[in-house]
A protein has these predicted regions:
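Non-catalytic cap/lid and distal C-terminal segments of serine-dependent acyl enzymes
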Residues: 1-268
Length: 268
């Protein structure tokens, strides 16, 4: 059972659970819950990498979405109420957040998603008196969390509003592209990539990835863009509603993802 306590003294509408053991990995995650102040709940957001949402001090790399003022502003201007359920990542993130492992490796990501939806989300909704059937449902993530948001919607199609910010496609390429056909036909896919995300690779992509991938290997920035655009193209070919943002000068961190997220949320 999840037990929630104060997350941060400056954020009195956000609560954090105790660490929850992922028995498959032997590592832990926490759950954060954010509820709107003085607003009826109209939207639920399931988010990954919760540690990077609300607090710079609690973030992994010193960047964070600064999500509370973003949501509060939208709630006031658009008469909405966002209920957020978010799960933190851990030291096994590359296993727990990769729904497309290669060579028959165990799929820890799908097991993690299933534990969220089958065990923890129902308890949270019950504790906070949230009726999911009446809400607009969003799943969001960035980088590897962007892969998780896509896979989550495939496994739990009621969460049909997908926000995938700079998805780390190379962890699951071409599996993620081939899996898109399994999305709910009512899915709306919001995808973005920046033009300056090259540093995330740490080396020339020609030295890292198979050169027979049908992507642009001319430089690291173009490689990232071409991979995300490949997902976009496949979505469009399959007839899914797709919103795509190519962020000029956009880098691979939450500071740059924040305005893109706001634009996507406005459209949902």
């Amino acid at each position: 059972m999840l037990l929630f306590s104060e997350y941060d003294k400056s954020l009195d509408n956000i609560y954090s659970s105790q660490p929850v053991v992922d028995i498959n990995l032997g590592d832990t995650n926490k759950y954060l819950v954010r509820f709107p102040k003085f607003k009826k709940v109209t939207h639920i957001i399931l988010a990954y990498d919760a540690e990077n949402l609300f607090s710079k001090e609690k973030s992994s790399y010193g960047y964070f979405f600064d999500l509370e003022p973003l949501l509060s502003d939208l709630e006031d201007r658009e008469n909405r109420g966002y209920f957020v359920v978010a799960t933190t990542s851990n030291s096994n993130r590359q296993k727990q957040y990769n729904p497309y492992p290669r060579n028959g490796s165990e799929n820890f990501a799908t097991k993690h998603i299933e534990s969220i939806f089958e065990t923890h989300l129902p308890q949270i909704c019950s504790d906070y008196d949230i009726e999911l059937s009446n809400l607009i449902k969003i799943v969001m993530g960035a980088s590897m969390g962007g892969l998780m948001s896509i896979k989550t919607s495939i496994l739990y199609p009621a969460f049909n509003n997908i926000i995938s910010l700079s998805p780390a496609f190379w962890f699951g390429y071409p599996g993620v592209v081939n899996d898109l056909i399994n999305l709910n036909k009512k899915s709306i896919c919001n995808i973005s990539v920046g033009t300056r995300e090259a540093d995330v690779f740490g080396d020339d992509v020609k030295n890292i990835f198979p050169n027979d991938w049908d992507l642009d290997f001319t430089n690291n920035n173009n490689f990232y863009i071409s991979g995300v655009e490949r997902i976009k193209k496949e979505l469009e070919l399959k007839g899914f509603r797709t919103n795509f943002i190519l962020q000029e000068e956009g880098k691979h961190n939450e500071t740059y993802w924040n305005p893109v997220l706001k634009e996507f949320l406005l459209s949902i």
